[in-house]
Amino acid sequence: MEFPDLGKHCSEPTCKQLDFLPITCDACKQDFCKDHFSYSGHKCPFAFKKDVQVPVCPLCNAPIPVRRGDIPDVVVGEHMDRDCTFHPGRNRNKVFTHRCSKEGCRKKEMLQLACAQCHGNFCIQHRHPLDHNCQAGSSSVSRGRSSASRAAEQKPSGVSWLAQRLRRTVK
């Protein structure tokens, strides 16, 4: 049993195959089989209207014009070598931007470490006033001991503190 109305014949003059799932060319609007549906497969006279490729550069996202017959990959490669405006070294954000203000030190830090007295920017090694010879508050910073070490020395230890508290309650 045949179904003469089912499917369509390929419009290619040399083929004329009955195809149950024909593909219509979007340029010339004719029906073709799977072997002849491409523009080059049936030598479409209107292919120049549809066969336009404009690849985009993967680096700078600019459209790259491609002439007929040129391979798009080659044209994009040439653009990347010659005309591309993307420069990875120039556009990259620097991570270590805060340079140490101590003479002779060339270290850079991710975060700004400012001295509370002179407000200079220093690295981890030179962030304390004693480490960078801070001149702004020289009277409050002694060379022998810092105020933190003196406060720790004046504070009684756990056992002596407990003993003092017990003496006060006994009296």
Curated annotation (Swiss-Prot):
Extract the SMART domains matched here: ZnF_AN1
The segments labelled Disordered in the record are 135-171
Which stretches does the record call AN1-type zinc fingers? Answer: 4-52, 94-142
Q: Where is the composition biased (Low complexity)?
A: 136-151
Q: What is the protein name for this chain?
A: AN1-type zinc finger protein 2A
Q: Which InterPro entries match?
A: AN1-like_Znf (IPR035896), Znf_AN1 (IPR000058)
* Residues annotated for Zn(2+) 2 binding in this entry: 25, 28, 42, 44
| Annotated binding of Zn(2+) 4, by residue | 115, 118, 132, 134
Spell out the GO cellular component terms annotated for this protein, sorted alphabetically and separated by semicolons.
cytoplasm; endoplasmic reticulum; nucleus; proteasome complex
